[in-house]
């Protein structure tokens, strides 16, 4: 009898609402950090294991899904990569532009007194682009081990096209392997409430939020701009694409992708979550198996906002005059830098000196701005990743749904 009750409880947990379970894990994590910091730090291992499991399965998932979708692609079957790529680039530039407007409307200043950290940023935009190109020709084993998604995509696409000429048995094997990896991903995602419980409790216990109050205004501008993009700019782009109320789709993506990304703080770790959401939304697998890992690499609206806001905060602090053409140029530079953020250790923060260089700000001061970024990173990085990752699914869904409606309308006319 006790065994039956236990199995019934496990079944309810396995089939219950994952979002509700995550909220429970979030509340319990906050309570544990408030009650006992040592215990909260100890259970941080649960969060580390969860993020590690997601990061471990994500490269294999991308390789197998992309390879299987291309190998089994039927001649004449249309994918929607081009409109999604356009949305990614337009969304990133729009975010940078919104950050410029927000920064001028609510100018922030910094206390540039902390010593620059012993880290070396890229010397220019050419180096960032060079890094991206070099990652394309990475060894496939090395790409898998280091989660180099550009390299993984290149090899997956190449192998997929090569396997198109293979036997049907080989194609079926690749497809079965893809399904097996997808099953493993779903299994890992079911442990999200436990992982988020560990992440929240350890983060609050080790960092707290007392150090953030000194940068409250900067954080309000940063997070406010990200909310503006998530709730106004992105919905406008989606409405332009699907021509109907975008908010049900926007909120679904924020709830089921953004929440995970906020706590894991890793676009790579969130790839399996986004893939599962795309499947739930019944999107075209050939499309999302490519667009989601591609989005985790180049769709960086949050990074564009971070680079722009922190750069203009440094500009306002130093009293450097900025005209409209320069502000527009900053939006372009921030967008280009953001697209290369995934290929730089330290992400968007270490690309701030590139943008600061536009205004003649010395590198030692620019690195102090980076140091400020690390201080507020607990919230900045979480919000940035949540915006980046949820937008990957949002734009993929918008493009797929727009294409489905176009095909349906054409069928009705004929």
From Swiss-Prot:
Q: Which GO terms describe its biological process?
A: serine transport; threonine transport
What compartments host this protein? Cell inner membrane
Q: Which reaction does it catalyse?
A: L-serine(in) + Na(+)(in) = L-serine(out) + Na(+)(out); L-threonine(in) + Na(+)(in) = L-threonine(out) + Na(+)(out)
- Keyword set, alphabetical order: Amino-acid transport, Cell inner membrane, Cell membrane, Membrane, Symport, Transmembrane, Transmembrane helix, Transport
Quick one: a GO cellular component term? plasma membrane
Q: Which PROSITE patterns match?
A: NA_DICARBOXYL_SYMP_1
Which superkingdom is the protein from? Bacteria
GO MF term (any one): neutral L-amino acid:sodium symporter activity
Q: Where do transmembrane segments lie in this chain?
A: 22-42, 46-66, 84-104, 143-163, 180-200, 219-239, 300-320, 332-352
Family recorded in the similarity comment:
Belongs to the dicarboxylate/amino acid:cation symporter (DAACS) (TC 2.A.23) family.
Query: What does the UniProt record say this protein does?
Result: Involved in the import of serine and threonine into the cell, with the concomitant import of sodium (symport system).
Protein name, entry field: Serine/threonine transporter SstT
Organism source for this protein?
Salmonella typhi
């Amino acid at each position: 009898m006790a065994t039956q009750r236990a199995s019934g409880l496990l079944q309810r947990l396995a089939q219950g609402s994952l979002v509700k379970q995550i909220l429970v894990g979030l509340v319990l994590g906050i309570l544990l950090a408030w009650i006992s910091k040592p215990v909260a730090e100890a259970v941080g291992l649960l969060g580390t294991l969860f993020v590690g499991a997601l990061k471990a399965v994500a490269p294999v998932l991308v390789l197998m899904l992309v390879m299987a979708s291309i190998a089994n692609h039927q001649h004449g079957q249309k994918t929607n990569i081009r409109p999604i790529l356009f949305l990614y680039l337009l969304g990133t530039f729009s975010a940078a532009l919104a950050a410029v407007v927000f920064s001028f409307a609510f100018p922030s200043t910094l206390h540039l007194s902390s010593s620059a950290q012993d880290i070396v940023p890229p010397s220019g935009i050419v180096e960032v682009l060079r890094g991206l190109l070099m990652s394309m020709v990475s060894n496939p084993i090395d790409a898998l081990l280091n989660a180099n998604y550009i390299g993984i995509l290149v090899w997956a696409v190449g192998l997929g096209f090569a396997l198109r000429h293979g036997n049907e048995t080989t194609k079926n094997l690749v497809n079965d392997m893809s399904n097996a990896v997808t099953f493993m991903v779903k299994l890992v995602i079911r442990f999200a409430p436990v992982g988020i419980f560990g992440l929240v409790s350890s983060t609050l216990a080790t960092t707290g939020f007392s150090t953030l109050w000194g940068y409250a205004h900067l954080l309000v501008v940063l997070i406010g701009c990200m909310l503006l993009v998530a709730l106004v700019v992105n919905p406008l782009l989606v409405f332009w694409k699907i021509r109907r109320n975008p908010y049900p789709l926007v909120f679904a993506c924020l709830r089921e992708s953004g929440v995970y990304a906020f706590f894991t703080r890793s676009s790579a770790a969130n790839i399996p979550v986004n893939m599962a959401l795309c499947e739930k939304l019944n999107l075209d697998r050939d499309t999302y198996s490519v667009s989601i890992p591609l989005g985790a690499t180049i769709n960086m609206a949050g990074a564009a906002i971070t680079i722009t806001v922190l750069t203009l905060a440094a500009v306002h602090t130093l009293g450097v005059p900025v005209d409209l053409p320069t502000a527009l140029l900053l939006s372009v530079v921030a967008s280009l830098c953001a697209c290369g953020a995934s290929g730089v250790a330290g992400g968007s923060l270490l690309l701030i000196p590139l943008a600061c260089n536009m205004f003649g700000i010395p590198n030692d001061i620019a690195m102090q701005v980076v140091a400020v970024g690390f201080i507020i990173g607990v919230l900045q990085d979480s919000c940035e990743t949540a915006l980046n990752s949820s937008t990957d699914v949002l734009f993929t869904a918008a493009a797929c749904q727009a294409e489905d409606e176009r095909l349906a309308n054409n069928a009705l006319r004929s």
